Regions:
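Core catalytic lobe of class I
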Residues: 1-200
Length: 200
């Protein structure tokens, strides 16, 4: 990222290691909290540097550091949080002493709170008023998805449905056709597609 020109990028999506001890080939994912946050601050500084003034930054992160990341991006780097989205997925983490985890946090951050790209018409979904009630007062163009995203398995691969407060996209499992290589945390194309359509 250091080789990119300052102010040259419209949209950045980052899915960094969550610092939960995952076995990566080239990265130690069990740093002390202070070291992890310092490392994070260094690469976010580069993200902010390369973003255009009206640029958008999306960050995917787990529970462990979600709050710290939001504060860091707002207070240290002056970004504005437009949305804090919850991505709900299948194939969650099986836990023994707490509820199973089946979500991640997606922060939609912008440099300028008044000038940024948000293509609402590109991500509209049918409303309950349209689908459930057949109400003629419903906007024929649908509505914006809520801040929790759902893509149900029965809707794959042709489309998606956003239910209240949840973005649901299944994680990319080993048998999925879109699976590339052996990376255990590959993001689904449809989730990234929604972000790209909305923000570029």
């Amino acid at each position: 990222m250091q080789s990119l020109a300052t102010g040259s990028v419209d949209l950045v999506f980052a899915d960094p290691p969550f610092n939960i001890g995952y076995d990566y080939d080239v990265y130690q994912d069990n740093l002390e909290a202070d070291d992890y946050l310092k490392w994070t601050s260094r690469w976010i500084e580069q993200v902010v540097r390369v973003l255009k003034d009206d640029g958008t930054f999306w960050l995917a992160i787990g529970d462990e550091y979600a709050a710290e990341m939001k504060v860091l991006m707002q207070q240290e780097f002056g970004l504005t949080c437009r949305s804090w989205v919850i991505w709900y997925y299948t194939f969650g983490v099986n836990c023994k002493r707490k509820f199973n985890r089946s979500h991640a946090h997606l922060f939609h951050m912008v440099k300028d709170s008044k000038q940024f790209t948000f293509n609402a018409s590109e991500i509209r979904v049918p409303s309950a008023r349209q689908l459930v009630y057949g109400d003629k007062r419903a906007n024929p163009n649908g509505r914006l998805p809520d801040d929790t995203w759902i893509l149900r398995p029965q809707d794959l691969p042709t489309g998606f449905t956003a239910d209240d407060d949840t973005w649901y996209f299944p994680r990319v499992a080993g048998t999925f056709k879109e699976r590339l290589g052996v990376h255990g945390c590959q993001m689904p194309e449809q989730l990234l597609g929604r972000i790209i359509r909305a923000s570029s």
